[in-house]
Every structure is written in structure tokens, then in C-alpha cells.
């Protein structure tokens, strides 16, 4: 089979890399992405490995790159993508990259520091000028000359009125949210021996750190006494106020203001030069950072891979072990040969035997990746196990569409996915960072098929936004029924519900060419008809899907050489499943084919027949579908029950018998091996895990000696119980196809009846259809997308996911493997 139907053959290779060419060879392998290295130094600490110094140097460079990246983002610039694919640089270039990076980082730190210092000085000058410009007039309190006011202190200052009557001033600026608290604290701490004036700046000033505009409150405080002045200075320091000297004379203030404006202009010129130099430094950073990040990341990845290698006894080469696809072995040999020849040495790679299970490698493209992701989300398949993904490409969208069948809804989903497919090569679409969008974009081909299959099942259900469409003429004739029955006006007035009898000549003209006849949308028993149809269809699809899963297990047994499981597991499982539930499908189809409208009144009940089948009984009122039906049903039940002990005991007894036979044969085999020379032995398998003995599920000597019959029997008992009970529960689980399909149809009907039908009625009555239908259609469109497409679509998706993971894959798929994760630079280049 191809690699999509089964994972590729993977071999364990041993690489001998000369020390001089080890870096070049591993770098080349990273560009190709062919091998997954095994850690041969698992017991060695990360700090004791050979290339730990180089890894630390790369990590220090990454920290510097992070600092430069933050500075670029702080400046509002965008890093350009690196041009082309950059190889991992030679080790000697690491020192050059480090020197250039450190020099740029230091220049940025110096320029940023100077810029912040200049901005802080400019901010101080602007605040000082704003304080002088605010026009605070020195208010000499009349507390000592005039009458008392409400702020006149009740007690005199310590020392009496003759202590110090000179008035001093403190001017400054404070943040607005601190001004009320500052004013209250000053008044209480100084006991009222001050006069404070607060005013808000008319224009905000740029904050020196954040660069955002900030408002400030200027203040002027008049006080008496040195002790009060000390208190005021301490309080303003606690509130981080900007305090400036205040000049009482108007001429002196104007002169100081002119001097401050001149200093501000000079500082702005210096700051402009600093910012221009900063732009030049950032331009050099934009040139160095994108390629430098890619190169250092690749270099670090190479050294981490080299740390997984062991050193030869002569210390002249590194020894590595890696998993590689057999298909890629020639490319691996060529890459090692070309890389090592550049250094004048030769690297060697050869396959070695291994008892460990190899990793799973399944190559995908942009179409199959989303379907393979659905399978891998449940569990990565074992090595060379049958891959469910090729079949999931068809079955998953189809089962989704069975629950989501509607032509209109499927068409909207198809167009949305088609738009993503057509725009998949646009850089803006790929670079979108929205996580929800990325989820939809990665599954665009899955959505495309889901929409396409929903259109198909929508035509079968004959539903388009819950409305039936008449593509072909109906197979029922109302006129023929009216002519034959003689319906009069009085009869029609008395009977609101009329019955079309298919036994009347000319009433039923034949089946509808495709899908359900649109006349069923007018019938009172429309829901009952759809219930019966979808329920039986769900059971049929479920049994076929599960039987297909059991059949796929045959390919696993044949490939791994476990042919005894064909008779002891697969055959009993198919007999049990088809003997019971396959027979139920047969009854449904047989009744469809053999029970016509003329015999509909006496049609037997399949449900009663199926129940009587297990009870070994018969209902006289429920006639048989075919002769000797009871004998056939009893035989099938007995045959299905007989498969249970075979399924339970067959495989354990076979393994135990084979185990004992090998134990008896082992001494003779060892004597023959001792007599035979080493060169006389047959060729061993290169990959020990994939040898014939391993494929047959055989065990090595240690495992054979430890084989416990109770564990084997317990494992098989769990498998038997799970399968037998699962046949019942899984068949019932497929009824969710019927339930969700019915729910989707009814929800669509309710949305149409409660929104669009009301809107159409209002438009006809009021005569303003164009005005009324615009908001109503907008509401209908929004609710259709939000409820029927997103919510109902997600629900159907999750149920289809469960049907594949539990009901289908557990019949043949273990999912206990692990992916081949090749050493590659692809993510770094992207």
C-alpha cells in the first residue's frame, strides 16, 4: 500500500560523523528534514554535554535579540521577514554575529538612556515654565491684619506673633489625582499656617517615560516660619511633586520664563538629533535582526542535536542514531557525502537492527493534512498500522452531512471554504494571528467537503433553508384523488385534512427522481415519515461503517503475520455483528422491497420481530416477512452467541499453545546454534521489530519466559466484552445521525416560521415590504449563521468526530504509536 494507507517503512540508522564535519552534516540534515535523532546521552545532565557552551552562547544571543525586538516594537516598527532561506552559519561566524549584536544593543541602551534623560530635563523645564506661566499671584494672608476667616488658625504658632513674619513661597506641580490629598495633608500638618493655590494646566504635557500626554496641577504655597517650610518640603517630596523656585517680582518671572524657553529649544534640538541617531541604529537593527534570529536559532538547533550524539573512543568522530524513512536513505547518504566532502572527510550511515517500535511516518499534503489531524487527535497509529485517514476523507464529511443536510446551509459553508481555498496563497491570509481564523483555515478543505456533502444530502432531504424545492414534478396527483373520490366543496369545507391513497389509480405516479418528494412538506405525517426514514438510514449506515472497520482489521492481521486472528477474532466479530445487526439491516431493506402500498395495512413490525428474535418467541398478530423466518432468526442468535467463547478463548489458547511449543523447542535450537558458526547463521532482519517473528506477535526470550496466562486471558476478556457490548451501544450511537438531522431540520423550520414568514406577512399587509424585509432578513441571516451554521455545525462536527473515534476506529485502530518528528529547520524558515 502507499504511504497514505499505511505508514512508511522506517529504519534505525547509525551515523558516524567526523568531528570536523559533524556541524556541517547535521546542518544539512536540518535543511532536508530526513531524520529524527535519538538521545544517546539520556543519562547525562544537560549541563555536562559536549556543546553546552555553544548552546549557552546561542541562548545569550537570543536574549539580546529579544531586547532588540522589544526596542523595535517600542519604536512602532515592524520586523521584515528574512529574505530567502538562510543556512545555519559556520561556527566561526557566531563570534561575529555576537559582536555586532552586542554593539547594537549597547548603542541602543546608551541612546535610550540619553533620550530619557533629555526628555526628563525637557519635561522639568516645561513644568517650570508652566508654573511660571499659570499666573499664581502671591497671596499675603491677612490672617495677622484682618479679621479671622474660616481658615484662620485658632492657636498662634509656637513662639508667638513676633517669631518670624516673613512670607516664603513654594511652587511646583503634582499629578491631578494627588492634589486633593496633598492639600488636605498640608492644611492639617501645618495647622493652617499657609495659603495654597492649585490650578490645572490648560494643555497636557508629554510624559517623559511613557510618551503619552498627561495633565498636571500647579500649586503655589505661601507659609510662615522655617519649621513649617520643612514640613511642606517633606510632604511634597512624599507626593513626588516637582518643586521649583518661585520669583515674586513680575519682571524676574518673565526673564526666567524667557530663559526656560531658550533652554527648552536647545534641549529639543539635542533631543531631535538623538532621535535621528536612534532611527539610524534601529535601521541597522532591522537589517541585522531577521537573518540573525534565523541563523542563531538554526545554530542552536544544530548544537542541541549534536548534544544527543555520543563520542567515539578515539574522540575523532561523533556517533548518532536516528530514525529515517527507508525511502529517504539514498538522500541521507548523498547529503552526508556532500557535506563531509566539503571538510575533506567522510561521514558514514548504515542501518542497524532495533527491537524498539519505530515511529510512524505518514506524509500529507495541504488537502489530506486536516483529515490526518482528525485521526492523530485520537491517537497516532502504531508503526505500519492501517491508517483510517484515507477513508475518513469520505466518511467524515458524509456523516456530518447526514446530520447537517440542507442545500442552503451547505452552500454557505462551501462558499466560505472555497474562498479560503482560493486565497490560501495570499501572505495576508497566512500571516493572520487570530487563533479561530487559523483553526478554520487549517481545516479549509475539510469544510469544503463538509459543505459539498451537505448540499448533496440537502437535495436528498429536499430542504433548502427548511423549504422544499420542486426540481422535478411530484409523483403524487391530487387531481386524480379528487376525481376518484368525488370531493365536493362541502366535503372540502368539512375536512381540513385530506388523504392521498396510493392504491387509487393515478394518485401515485412513481417515485421522485432524486430525494424526497416535495409534497411531503405539506403532509401532516411529514415528521413521522422523516423519523422512520432517518432512523432506519442511521442504523444501516452505522452497521456498514462498523463492519467496514472490522474488515480493515484484516489488513492489519495479514500485514503483521497474525493470521490466526483472522479465524479467532475477525471471523467471530463479523459473524456476531452481521448475524444480529446486519440481519436488522436486511429486515429493513427486505421490507422496503417487498411490502407495497396495497399491503401497508398489514405490514409487520421490524422492531417486534427483532425483539422476538432474542426472546425466541413469536407474536401471532405480527405476520412473518418470509417463510421460516423464526428458524433463521434462532439460528443467527445461536451462531452469534457461539462466537463469544471463540472470541474470548481462541487467541489466548493459541498464544499459550505456541508459547509452550517454543519453550520445548528452545534447548534443541540453542544446541544447534552453538554448533553452527557465526557465518553459517541466516541473515538477520535489519529492523528487528519488523521481522517475521515480531509481525506474528511473537515475543522475545525474556517476554516468552514472563508470559502470564491470566494476563493474556484478562486482556482478551476485556476486548471481547468491549466488542460485544460495543456492537449494541455503538449501533444505538449511530442514531445520533437521525436525532441531529431531525433537530437541524426542525430548528431551521422554526427560524423560518418565526422570522421570515412573519416578515413576509407584515410586508404584504402594510405595503412596505422593502422597508420591513431589510431588517428582518438581516436578523434571519445573522441567526442562520450564528445558530444553524456555527452552533449546529459544531455540534454535528463533534458527533461525527465521536462516531469515527469510538464507533469506527476502535474496530481496528489502536492509536498507540508516536510520530516521526524529523530534525528540520522548516518552522524556523517559515
From Swiss-Prot:
Q: Which GO terms describe its molecular function?
A: ATPase binding; proton-transporting ATPase activity, rotational mechanism
Topological domain spans for side Vacuolar: 405-406, 469-532, 592-635, 746-766
Q: Which UniProt keywords are present, listed alphabetically?
A: Disease variant, Hydrogen ion transport, Ion transport, Membrane, Osteopetrosis, Transmembrane, Transmembrane helix, Transport
Could you tell me the Gene Ontology terms of the biological process aspect for this record? apoptotic process; autophagosome assembly; B cell differentiation; bone resorption; cellular defense response; cellular response to cytokine stimulus; dentin mineralization; enamel mineralization
Places the protein is found: Membrane
Give yes or no: UniProt keyword Cell inner membrane. Answer: no
Q: Name one Pfam family in it.
A: V_ATPase_I
Q: Which family does it belong to?
A: Belongs to the V-ATPase 116 kDa subunit family.
Disease entry from the Swiss-Prot or TrEMBL record: Osteopetrosis, autosomal recessive 1: A rare genetic disease characterized by abnormally dense bone, due to defective resorption of immature bone. Osteopetrosis occurs in two forms: a severe autosomal recessive form occurring in utero, infancy, or childhood, and a benign autosomal dominant form occurring in adolescence or adulthood. Recessive osteopetrosis commonly manifests in early infancy with macrocephaly, feeding difficulties, evolving blindness and deafness, bone marrow failure, severe anemia, and hepatosplenomegaly.
The protein, known as: V-type proton ATPase 116 kDa subunit a 3
Q: State the organism of origin.
A: Homo sapiens (Human)
Which gene is annotated as encoding this protein in its UniProt record?
A: TCIRG1
Amino acid at each position: 500500500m502507499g504511504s497514505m494507507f499505511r505508514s512508511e517503512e522506517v529504519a534505525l540508522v547509525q551515523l558516524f560523523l567526523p568531528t570536523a564535519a559533524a556541524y556541517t552534516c547535521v546542518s544539512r540534515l536540518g535543511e532536508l528534514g530526513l531524520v529524527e535523532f535519538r538521545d544517546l546521552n539520556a543519562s547525562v545532565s544537560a549541563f555536562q554535554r559536549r556543546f553546552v557552551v555553544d548552546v549557552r552562547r546561542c541562548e545569550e544571543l537570543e536574549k539580546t535579540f529579544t531586547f532588540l525586538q522589544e526596542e523595535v516594537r517600542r519604536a512602532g516598527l515592524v520586523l521584515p521577514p528574512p529574505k530567502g532561506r538562510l543556512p545555519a552559519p559556520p561556527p566561526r561566524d557566531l563570534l561575529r554575529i555576537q559582536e555586532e549584536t552586542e554593539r547594537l544593543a549597547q548603542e541602543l541602551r546608551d541612546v535610550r538612556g540619553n533620550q530619557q534623560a533629555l526628555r526628563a530635563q525637557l519635561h522639568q523645564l516645561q513644568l517650570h515654565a508652566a508654573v511660571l506661566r499659570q499666573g499664581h499671584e502671591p497671596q499675603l494672608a491677612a490672617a495677622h491684619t484682618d479679621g479671622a476667616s474660616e481658615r484662620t488658625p485658632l492657636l498662634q504658632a509656637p513662639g508667638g506673633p513676633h517669631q518670624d513674619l516673613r512670607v516664603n513661597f513654594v511652587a511646583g506641580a503634582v499629578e491631578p489625582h494627588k492634589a486633593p490629598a496633598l492639600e488636605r495633608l498640608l492644611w492639617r500638618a501645618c495647622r493652617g499656617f499657609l495659603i495654597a493655590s492649585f490650578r490645572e494646566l490648560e494643555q497636557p504635557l508629554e510624559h517623559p517615560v511613557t510618551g503619552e500626554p498627561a495633565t498636571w496641577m500647579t500649586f503655589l504655597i505661601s507659609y510662615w516660619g522655617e519649621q513649617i517650610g520643612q514640613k511642606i518640603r517633606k510632604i511634597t517630596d512624599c507626593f513626588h511633586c516637582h518643586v521649583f523656585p518661585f520669583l515674586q517680582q513680575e519682571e524676574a518671572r518673565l526673564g526666567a520664563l524667557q530663559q526656560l524657553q531658550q533652554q527648552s529649544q536647545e534641549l529639543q534640538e539635542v533631543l531631535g538629533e538623538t532621535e535621528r541617531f536612534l532611527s539610524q541604529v534601529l535601521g541597522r537593527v532591522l537589517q541585522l535582526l531577521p537573518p540573525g534570529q534565523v541563523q542563531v536559532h538554526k545554530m542552536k538547533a544544530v548544537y542541541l542535536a549534536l548534544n544527543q550524539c555520543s563520542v567515539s573512543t578515539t574522540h575523532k568522530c561523533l556517533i548518532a542514531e536516528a530514525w529515517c524513512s527507508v525511502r529517504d536513505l539514498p538522500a541521507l547518504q548523498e547529503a552526508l557525502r556532500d557535506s563531509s566532502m566539503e571538510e575533506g572527510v567522510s561521514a558514514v550511515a548504515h542501518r542497524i537492527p532495533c527491537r524498539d517500535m519505530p515511529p510512524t511516518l505518514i506524509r500529507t499534503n495541504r488537502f489530506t493534512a486536516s483529515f490526518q489531524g482528525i485521526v492523530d487527535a485520537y491517537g497516532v497509529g502504531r508503526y505500519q498500522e492501517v491508517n483510517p485517514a484515507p477513508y475518513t476523507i469520505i466518511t467524515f464529511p458524509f456523516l456530518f452531512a447526514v446530520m447537517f443536510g440542507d442545500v442552503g446551509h451547505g452552500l454557505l459553508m462551501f462558499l466560505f471554504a472555497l474562498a479560503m481555498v482560493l486565497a490560501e496563497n495570499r501572505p495576508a491570509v497566512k500571516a493572520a494571528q487570530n487563533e479561530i481564523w487559523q483553526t478554520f483555515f487549517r481545516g479549509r478543505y475539510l469544510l469544503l467537503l463538509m459543505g459539498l456533502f451537505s448540499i448533496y444530502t440537502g437535495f436528498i432531504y429536499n430542504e433548502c433553508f427548511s423549504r422544499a424545492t420542486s426540481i422535478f414534478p411530484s409523483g403524487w396527483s391530487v387531481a386524480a384523488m379528487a376525481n376518484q373520490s368525488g370531493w365536493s366543496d362541502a366535503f372540502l369545507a368539512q375536512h381540513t385534512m385530506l388523504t392521498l391513497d396510493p392504491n387509487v389509480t393515478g394518485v401515485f405516479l412513481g417515485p421522485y427522481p432524486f430525494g424526497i418528494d416535495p409534497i411531503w412538506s405539506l403532509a401532516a405525517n411529514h415528521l413521522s415519515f422523516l423519523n422512520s426514514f432517518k432512523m432506519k438510514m442511521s442504523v444501516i449506515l452505522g452497521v456498514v461503517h462498523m463492519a467496514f472497520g472490522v474488515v480493515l482489521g484484516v489488513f492489519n492481521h495479514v500485514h503483521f503475520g497474525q493470521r490466526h486472528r483472522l479465524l479467532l477474532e475477525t471471523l467471530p466479530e463479523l459473524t456476531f455483528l452481521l448475524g444480529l445487526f446486519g440481519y436488522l439491516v436486511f429486515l429493513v431493506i427486505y421490507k422496503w422491497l417487498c411490502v407495497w402500498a396495497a399491503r401497508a395495512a398489514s405490514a409487520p413490525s421490524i422492531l417486534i420481530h427483532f425483539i422476538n428474535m432474542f426472546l425466541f418467541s413469536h407474536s401471532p398478530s405480527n405476520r412473518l416477512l418470509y417463510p421460516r423466518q423464526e428458524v433463521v432468526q434462532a439460528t443467527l442468535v445461536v451462531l452469534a452467541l457461539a462466537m463469544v467463547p471463540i472470541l474470548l478463548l481462541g487467541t489466548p489458547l493459541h498464544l499459550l499453545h505456541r508459547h509452550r511449543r517454543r519453550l520445548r523447542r528452545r534447548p534443541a535450537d540453542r544446541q544447534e546454534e552453538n554448533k553452527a558458526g557465526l557465518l553459517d547463521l541466516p541473515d538477520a532482519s535489519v529492523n528487528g521489530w519488523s521481522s517475521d517473528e515480531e509481525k506474528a506477535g511473537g515475543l522475545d526470550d525474556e517476554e516468552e519466559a514472563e508470559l502470564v496466562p491470566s494476563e493474556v486471558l484478562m486482556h482478551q476478556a476485556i476486548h471481547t466484552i468491549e466488542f460485544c457490548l460495543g456492537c449494541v451501544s455503538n449501533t444505538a450511537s449511530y442514531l445520533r445521525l437521525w436525532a441531529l438531522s431531525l433537530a437541524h431540520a426542525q430548528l431551521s423550520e422554526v427560524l423560518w416560521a418565526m422570522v421570515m414568514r412573519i416578515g413576509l406577512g407584515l410586508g404584504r399587509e402594510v405595503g412596505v415590504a422593502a422597508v420591513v424585509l431589510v431588517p428582518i432578513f438581516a436578523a434571519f441571516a445573522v441567526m442562520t449563521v450564528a445558530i444553524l451554521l456555527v452552533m449546529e455545525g459544531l455540534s454535528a462536527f463533534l458527533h461525527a468526530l465521536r462516531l469515527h473515534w469510538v464507533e469506527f476506529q476502535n474496530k481496528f485502530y489502536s492509536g498507540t504509536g508516536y510520530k516521526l518528528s524529523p530534525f528540520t529547520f522548516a518552522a524556523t524558515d517559515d
